[in-house]
A protein has these predicted regions:
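Acidic, divalent-metal-coordinating active-site segment for phosphoryl/phosphodiester hydrolysis
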Residues: 143-156
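Short, glycine/acidic-enriched loop or turn micro-motifs at the edges of active sites
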Residues: 7-9, 113, 150
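Conserved non-catalytic scaffold segment of RNase H-like nuclease domains
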Residues: 1-107, 120-142
Length: 172
């Protein structure tokens, strides 16, 4: 299960999730999607609105995280979670799990770490830079489900590259 979140800032303690997007991958294909806005109950900062194009009006009528998180966790149940720069996304998921009393035990993979191993000569390992290097389309960057879908395609390509090099994720 590959996922991405958009937030009101960089601190999982002080900032809020405003969008969660996720896709399930099976046999190298996307087989299911989860996408929702989250009402952060605080105004979205201007810089975040500029980056994501998500406005207060977009999230105003959406459920808050206490409703969305259990749905997201159910979507992820039994899956290894994959994200680009996973420590950021996971810190928000784990903080919200802590706040709402959900278990915080997750198995996750970070495509940035794999990128640093497989694309050694690349100077930037941002989602858009890696996508460009691998020839993967990234539409609506900084929208959660689109970033998750792009990350899924990157992850599938990385798995193929690892198999070709006779490596596995265990060695990374």
């Amino acid at each position: 299960e590959v996922f991405d979140i958009e937030t009101t800032g960089f601190s999982p303690v002080n900032n809020r999730i405003i969008e969660i997007g996720a896709v399930k991958v099976s046999g190298g294909e996307i087989v299911d999607r989860f996408s929702t806005f989250v009402n952060p109950d605080v105004p979205i900062p201007f810089e975040i609105e500029k980056l994501t194009s998500i406005r207060d009006e977009d999230v105003m009528d959406s459920p808050q995280i206490d409703v969305i998180l259990p749905q997201f966790l159910q979507f992820c149940e039994g899956c290894i979670m994959v994200a680009h720069n996973a420590s950021f996304d996971m810190s928000f998921i784990m903080e919200n799990c802590r706040r709402l009393g959900y278990p915080q035990e997750f198995t996750y993979v970070d495509t940035v770490g794999i990128s640093r191993v497989l694309l050694k000569n690349q100077s930037k390992h941002t989602l858009d830079a890696v996508a460009k290097t691998l020839g993967i389309s990234l539409e609506n960057h900084h929208r959660a489900v689109d970033d998750a879908e792009c990350t899924a395609h990157i992850f599938v390509k990385f798995i193929k590259m690892l198999e070709e090099q006779d490596l596995s994720l265990i060695h990374i």
